[in-house]
Amino acid sequence: MKQILPIDVANIKELLMINAFDEPVTLNDLLFACFIIERLSRRIHRSNLYVVTNIKTEGITYLLEFATTLHSQNFNQTCDEMILEYKLKNGKIVKPEKPSDLLIGNVYSELIWKVQQEDLVQTVIDVYNSPICKVIDNYKTLAYLDPTPVLVNAYYNKRY
């Protein structure tokens, strides 16, 4: 018979990322952050990797910590503020309107949520730097439609 150990709430807090309002960061907060990363990449015609690399840990942390309030703000305003704050430059990549930025944000958030270790922000950076992201971002491959377990497996194998 399995022994059930009491849960030490103080230690759980150390395992979770806590937002600016002293609440755990949720999957919805992560979805918002990934959606804004995708929307930014489309607005400035650059890859998601460019956005993640340039907003760095600080920008990703900001999106996750304030997602509960930022989602009430106009998304384009959030993007405009981040473009100015992190000096994001326009590029030449033109992404199609479909799949939507929300759908791609959902694909990334589900993948990140499943593979996260201790540091959620570092996991975001690691996933966007993974070789499989080039496959996911090539919409002709339709990889973004694959079930999350397939993407998780590809992430751990470092190839699609």
Positions of predicted regions on the chain:
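Long, compositionally biased
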Residues: 5-15, 68-101, 155
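N-terminal interaction modules that seed assembly of large macromolecular complexes
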Residues: 19-83
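A general marker of short, structured functional hotspots
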Residues: 28, 82, 104, 124, ...
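Alpha-helix capping and helix-coil boundary motifs
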Residues: 47, 74, 119-123, 146-147
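Alpha-helix initiation/capping motif
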Residues: 56, 86-87, 147
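Amphipathic protein-protein interaction modules
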Residues: 86-134
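Glycine-rich, aromatic-bearing surface loops/beta-hairpins
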Residues: 129-160
